[in-house]
Structure formats: structure tokens, C-alpha cells
């Protein structure tokens, strides 16, 4: 019905999307730092610095996206119930988990392309994504409801991200190790968080203290960052690129 559709759309735009976009404040801040750094390096024809900065920022954006995706996949339903007291919010949060890596990477890639002075390129790619989203809204949403809209949202973001990435790979000649920076961290984090989720639920059943049990996420996140550091995915040297 119309009331149900408006209720779900309100949950999506007012509750779920702000939750998805919240970690993106990190990539948004990174984009602010990137724009002058890339513009300065591009003006000096320092292609090595441009390649190195692009590689590092893509890596960190991917890791942030993978981490948030794994958290929302495993704890989306719990967060929906715990924070918003809404089962629908939890379902939508879980469904949109895969949006995170592409959304965060697109933000940084767009800033790099703008720093290179190619704002028309980012505009064109954004228009392509919007056309896909509007097309899904017209053709899929009437048939599949909110899932048609979510499919269009995810597809458009993937297309924009891929267009940005392919353009930068041709422009700066960088290579992105997808297995090292996306696949294996994703498998590790999803597995680790799934195990912690089972352990937390058993602990909640025994102690009846949900707030205390979810504190176990802190050592899990610490273990994740330790894994990133030990595998060479993050480094102290990377910070110097933005100075």
C-alpha cells in the first residue's frame, strides 16, 4: 500500500542511509586533503606522487568499505533492532552493506580526478550513474518495490566506481590488487565478525547483558586493524603523502 511504501522509504532515507554514510565522513575528509595535494603534484608534473597518493587512498578507502560492509552484513539486523527498534531498518541496513566499498572508493576517486582538473569526467560518470538509477526506479521499482530501487542504487554506484577506477588506471597507470586489498580482507573480516556474533549471542543468552556482550566488538576491531598492519595493508609512512 501507499502507507507501507512511504514508511519503508522513510526508514531508508531517514535511518538506514545516514548509518551507511556515516563512515563516509572519513573518506569525505580525505577527499578534502586529496584535492590540493593532487592538484599541486599534477601542476609540478610529479606523476610518481600522483600514482602513489592514488594507490594509498584507494587502498584505505577499500579497507574502510570492507570493514563497514562486514560489520553491517553481520550486525545489520542487530543494529536495526538495538538502535532504531525496527526490523525493517535492520534488513535494509544488511542489504545495503555491499554499497559501502563502492561508495567510499568513489568519493576518493572523484576527488583525485577533480584534482587532475578533469571535472567534466566526474560529471559525465555521475550522470551515467543517475541514468541507471532513474531507469531502475521507473522499470524495476513498480515490479519489485523497494528492492528494485536498492538494486538501481547499488548498480549505479558500482558503475560510477568502475568508471572512475578504469579512467584513473589509464591516466595514472596504477594497478589495484583486488585480491589483496578487497577479497582476502573481506573474507577475514566477515568470518571473524560472524564468529564474534555467535559468541556474543551465546554470551547474551547466558548473562542477559546485551550491552556488555557487544563490547566484545572492540577487541574484534582491534584484531582487524592488527591484521591490516601485519599484512602491510596500512602503514605509518602513508600519512606523509598528505603533508
Task: Set out the residue ranges of the language-model regions.
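Short alpha-helical transmembrane segments in multi-pass integral membrane proteins
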Residues: 53-74, 79-82, 141, 147-172, ...
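Interfacial segments at transmembrane-helix termini and the short loops linking adjacent helices
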Residues: 6, 72-103
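Membrane-proximal transmembrane or re-entrant/amphipathic helices at the cytosolic face
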Residues: 198-243
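Hydrophobic alpha-helical transmembrane segments in multi-pass integral membrane proteins
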Residues: 134-138, 189-205
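Helix-loop junctions and terminal segments of transmembrane helices
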Residues: 24-57
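Alpha-helical transmembrane segments
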Residues: 109-117, 165-181
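Alpha-helical transmembrane segments of polytopic membrane transporters and translocases
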Residues: 5-27, 59-60
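Membrane-interface junctions at transmembrane-helix termini in multi-pass inner-membrane proteins
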Residues: 98-128, 139, 143
Amino acid at each position: 500500500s501507499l502507507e507501507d511504501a512511504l514508511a519503508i522509504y522513510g526508514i531508508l532515507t531517514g535511518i538506514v542511509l545516514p548509518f551507511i554514510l556515516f563512515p563516509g565522513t572519513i573518506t569525505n575528509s580525505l577527499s578534502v586533503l586529496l584535492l590540493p595535494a593532487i592538484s599541486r603534484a599534477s601542476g609540478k608534473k610529479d606523476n610518481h606522487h600522483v600514482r602513489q597518493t592514488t594507490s594509498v587512498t584507494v587502498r584505505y578507502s577499500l579497507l574502510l568499505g570492507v570493514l563497514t560492509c562486514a560489520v553491517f552484513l553481520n550486525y545489520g539486523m542487530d543494529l536495526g533492532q538495538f538502535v532504531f527498534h525496527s526490523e525493517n531498518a535492520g534488513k535494509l541496513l544488511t542489504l545495503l552493506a555491499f554499497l559501502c566499498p563502492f561508495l567510499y572508493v568513489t568519493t576518493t576517486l572523484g576527488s583525485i580526478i577533480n584534482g587532475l582538473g578533469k571535472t567534466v569526467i566526474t560529471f559525465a560518470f555521475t550522470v551515467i550513474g543517475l541514468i541507471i538509477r532513474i531507469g531502475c526506479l521507473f522499470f524495476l521499482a513498480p515490479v519489485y518495490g523497494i528492492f528494485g530501487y536498492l538494486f538501481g542504487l547499488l548498480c549505479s554506484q558500482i558503475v560510477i566506481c568502475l568508471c572512475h577506477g578504469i579512467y584513473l588506471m589509464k591516466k595514472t597507470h596504477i594497478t589495484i590488487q583486488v585480491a589483496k586489498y578487497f577479497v582476502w580482507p573481506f573474507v577475514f573480516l566477515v568470518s571473524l565478525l560472524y564468529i564474534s556474533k555467535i559468541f556474543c549471542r551465546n554470551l547474551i543468552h547466558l548473562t542477559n547483558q546485551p550491552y556488555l556482550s557487544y563490547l566484545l566488538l572492540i577487541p574484534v576491531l582491534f584484531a582487524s586493524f592488527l591484521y591490516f598492519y601485519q599484512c602491510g595493508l596500512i602503514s605509518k609512512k602513508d600519512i606523509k603523502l598528505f603533508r
